[in-house]
From Swiss-Prot:
GO molecular function: ATP binding; cysteine-tRNA ligase activity; zinc ion binding
SUPFAM superfamilies attached to this UniProt entry: Anticodon-binding domain of a subclass of class I aminoacyl-tRNA synthetases, Nucleotidylyl transferase
This protein's GO CC annotations: cytosol
Substrates-to-products reaction catalysed: tRNA(Cys) + L-cysteine + ATP = L-cysteinyl-tRNA(Cys) + AMP + diphosphate
Protein name: Cysteine--tRNA ligase
Complex and partners: Monomer.
Species of origin: Acinetobacter baumannii (strain SDF)
Length: 473
């Protein structure tokens, strides 16, 4: 089990990971609020934590992965009322859609996916504890607020100072009469007409968003656990508020390491509905194979901002297809033959990249070099070396959740045909024409066919077993 470093958002630097329990990692990631289809920003968070977990497990870590579902929220209530359906009908429909999208992207299911509505009692217990400790207070209207000035370390995750924030609060925060401080946040909301509610010591109502994650994470993983993650947009106020209410309630450190995934921009601008550049995963899958979306996400470091565009996805499509063609070229000669012997130099370089804050950009550079070596070994008919390189590449792409489809099925899909410009059947037909030309000693025609295919990105390689083809690197 190789030591690894990760960027801890709270410390604002890369640090070596030290588990609370030897060989075990407990991880909680903020999931979706299920009132609509998941967008490409959600896709990045899902895929990033998926390949992080896949890698850690490949290294021998026993990872317990919790990703919650927010199934009660202002947006959910509003959308259900607009649609004329119950909240449960709405949320179950979009939970199913979310799980389907995640599966299409090749993401492993979390070990547990707690729903907020299943933990109302635990949320009320935490709120009651905060009130009893003087860290929270009930307002006259039935709301309960967390008092931020009672938590001295408030702002330590985001690097914000409460005094600085308060100075401009009148411009940024709706100062409610019931609040003692403009940044006090709601733990329990009093019941309103036509909204779901639960009985509580403070009257009927429902939980605030922030308390949901604190209750679910600590119930599933304990008061103090290893890693908490989510999108960068959640750092403040959501994760900041989680720390405050959790530590004020338990008296223990909440989380050891915070991981935040960077933003996705669309054609250089921040993704937003108002700009009309907001795309759901399903929108994008109408044009691109889901594994191309995954490749696009994997190819950049998880903390870096990424520009989403058709051009970027087409580049991802071309690059991913090269791996499939290398696999096809190998399988045409050696079938599915693999070996447990791996090229340790490539494995070590790949692991070193991933152990440096899960640097997939560097890891992919290693895989491209390995892919080129595999193509060379197949071309030179070095059977033993080709088998080792193929087995190594398959092992490492599996860790990243790439090249997971049947080679022929993938290359016959729209993505494969677009990348090649020629279908498999068309290429095989050209190869047969070339074989016939060589038999007829029409070498000029044979050379012409080879050159024509090369210009269309198809490389022919003559071996003892016959002619095989692949996409040019």
């Amino acid at each position: 089990m190789q030591p690894f470093v990760l960027y801890n958002s709270e410390q604002r630097k890369k640090v070596e990971f030290v588990p609370r329990k030897e060989g075990h990692i407990d991880m909680y990631v903020c999931g979706m609020t299920v009132y609509d289809y998941c967008h490409i920003g959600h896709a990045r968070v899902m895929v990033a934590f998926d390949y992080i977990i896949r890698f850690l497990r490949s290294q021998g870590w026993k990872v317990r992965y919790i990703r919650n579902i927010t199934d009660i929220d202002d947006k959910i209530i509003k959308r259900a009322n607009e649609n004329g359906e119950t909240i449960q009908q709405l949320t179950m429909r979009f939970i199913d859609a979310m799980n389907e999208d995640a599966a299409n992207l090749g993401c492993l299911a979390p070990d547990e996916a707690p729903k907020a509505t299943e933990y109302i009692d635990q949320m009320q217990n935490m709120i009651g504890n905060l009130v009893n400790k003087g860290a929270a207070y009930p307002a006259s209207n039935g709301d309960v607020y967390f008092e931020v000035t009672k938590f001295e370390k408030y702002g330590r995750l985001s690097g914000r100072k409460l005094d600085d924030m308060q100075a401009g609060a009148s411009e940024r925060v709706d100062v409610e009469v019931e609040k003692k401080h403009p940044f006090d946040f709601v733990l329990w909301k009093h019941a309103k007409e036509n909204e779901p509610s639960w009985a509580s010591p403070w009257g009927n109502g429902r939980p605030g968003w922030h308390i949901e994650c604190s209750a679910m994470s600590t119930c599933c993983l304990g008061n103090h656990f290893d890693i908490h993650g989510g999108g960068s947009d959640l750092m403040f106020p959501h994760h900041e508020n989680e720390i405050a209410q959790s530590e004020a309630s338990t008296g223990e450190q909440y989380v050891n390491y915070w991981i935040h995934v960077g933003f996705i921009n669309v054609d250089g601008e921040k993704m937003s509905k108002s700009l009309g550049n907001f795309f759901t995963i399903r929108d994008v899958m109408e044009k691109f194979h889901p594994e191309v979306i995954r490749y696009f996400i994997v190819s950049s470091h998880y903390r870096s901002p990424v520009n989403f565009s058709d051009v970027a996805l087409k580049e991802a499509k071309t690059s991913l297809t090269r791996f499939y063609h290398s696999f096809k070229a190998y399988q045409q000669v050696y079938g599915q033959t693999t070996t447990e012997t791996l090229d340790q130099s490539f494995v070590e370089r790949f692991n070193n990249a991933m152990c440096d804050d899960f640097n997939t950009a560097e890891a992919m550079a290693v895989l491209f070099e390995l892919n080129k070596e595999l193509n060379r070994a197949v071309k030179e008919e070095q059977a033993d070396q080709a088998t080792v390189l193929y087995s190594t590449l398959r092992h490492l792409t599996n860790i990243l959740g790439l090249v997971q489809h049947n080679v022929d099925d993938f290359l016959k899909s729209d993505i494969g045909q677009e990348a090649l410009a020629l279908s498999d059947a068309e290429i095989e037909d050209f190869i047969q024409q070339r074989v016939d030309a060589k038999k007829a000693k029409d070498f000029a025609k044979a050379d012409s066919i080879r050159q024509s295919l090369l210009e269309q990105g198809v490389v022919l390689e003559d071996t003892r077993q016959g002619t095989v083809w692949r996409r040019a690197d």
